[in-house]
């Protein structure tokens, strides 16, 4: 069976906004070029919720994974950059899927703006912020894919 390419209409991505306490998850396809928030996972820096991540991988059956890379504004690394890279590497090794690391600078600010514009009350931001940040990261990735937009 030939390998799928990013232009395949069924090429699905699962994206993660990695944090030490919460991990936002989003899904999107190369065909629709649209990312959607899925959920926010709780975990710790050393022990993400691998059971729920495995369930999500099994449910969505992505062809590739996307992880946000929290760089400093000048493009340099920081401790969270290294942690996100390590998380991405663990995902790649566990699930044997291609991994794309994507610059996520300002994604949380964009996510906060999206929630405000959608009228989501501030008290509900915490539960939605990370998954909308993952959506923002994945949307930026999908926007950069080669080929025509739908």
Q: Can you describe what each PLM-predicted range is?
A:
Residues 1-16, 20-150:
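Phosphate- and other anionic-substrate recognition elements at nucleic-acid/protein interfaces
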């Amino acid at each position: 069976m030939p390998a799928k390419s990013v232009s395949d209409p069924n090429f699905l991505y699962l994206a993660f906004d990695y944090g030490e306490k919460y991990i936002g998850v989003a899904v999107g396809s190369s065909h629709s070029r649209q990312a959607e928030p899925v959920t926010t996972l709780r975990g710790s820096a050393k022990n993400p919720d691998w059971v729920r991540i495995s369930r999500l991988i099994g449910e969505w059956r992505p062809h590739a994974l996307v992880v946000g890379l929290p760089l400093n504004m000048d493009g340099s690394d920081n401790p969270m950059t290294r942690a996100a890279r390590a998380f991405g590497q663990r995902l790649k090794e566990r699930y044997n899927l291609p991994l794309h690391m994507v610059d996520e600078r300002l994604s949380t600010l964009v996510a906060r703006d999206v929630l405000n514009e959608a009228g989501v009350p501030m008290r509900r931001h915490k539960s939605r912020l990370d998954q909308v940040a993952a959506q923002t990261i994945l949307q930026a990735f999908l926007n950069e894919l080669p080929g025509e937009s739908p």
